[in-house]
């Protein structure tokens, strides 16, 4: 590593130059050099230099590209909060559970990485992580979908939504009579809480007497584009939503999104807490699940979902948007 060049870049607060410097060290696989550069930038920040961004970028590239031991060394609670995603998720996107298990001792990080790797196909022993942090098993159930996961790159990240079936226009019936919600509407809103807590989005959720279309009408539109979907497709959409921070909030990660989606199922089925047997939640496949949108230019981050319980004659709908 060229320490003289690094000194010049830091003292001149050349942010673009420091990012290119990190990229060069990654190309040469000089992990020790990246760690030194990160530490020197942190020291310079204490002297008033505005080089915290390149320091965070160095940590990001270590989590993304370095061997597992180097990646694990930069992890910590809250790390990556202001980046494209939490550093534990960045590291877990590139390193297997076998590589990471013995290197991560902080219970929160261990649980999140274990769940992320289980979602990505690794076998994770539930007894190897704290079950109180993510209160669902790190084992995909037969009724669950293949969840869309974040794809981290040197220059950014993609959050694929997965395949969505086409939507068709329908005229909506009269709005259903709104009734007091006993939990599901709050669980649906929890999927998107960072969109208004930390960002500039908004969301509405209702419970009504009637079917899914009556619930959608209660949100506001007279017409909507809709499609009926399977439980798996609805779970994938909810987990994708719950993992995000919206346009400007902090990303929570797919394990959080999956757990929040399970909680929606539990509340819809009348549970006050998560059932001991995960297979009990498969009963939610008997509900009618509808993805919809109001047909205008939604853009940004959006979730439009309706759920109908035909046996009890009630339905729920959520409309959430956070414009990028």
Write out the residue ranges for each language-model feature.
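Extended aliphatic helical segments
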Residues: 19-22, 26, 45, 51, ...
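C-terminal, beta-strand-rich globular interaction domains
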Residues: 217-324
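Short, low-complexity intrinsically disordered segments
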Residues: 29, 50, 86, 95, ...
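Generic detector of well-ordered alpha-helical segments enriched in charged/polar residues
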Residues: 7, 19-23, 35-38, 42, ...
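Charged, amphipathic alpha-helical stretches
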Residues: 1-65
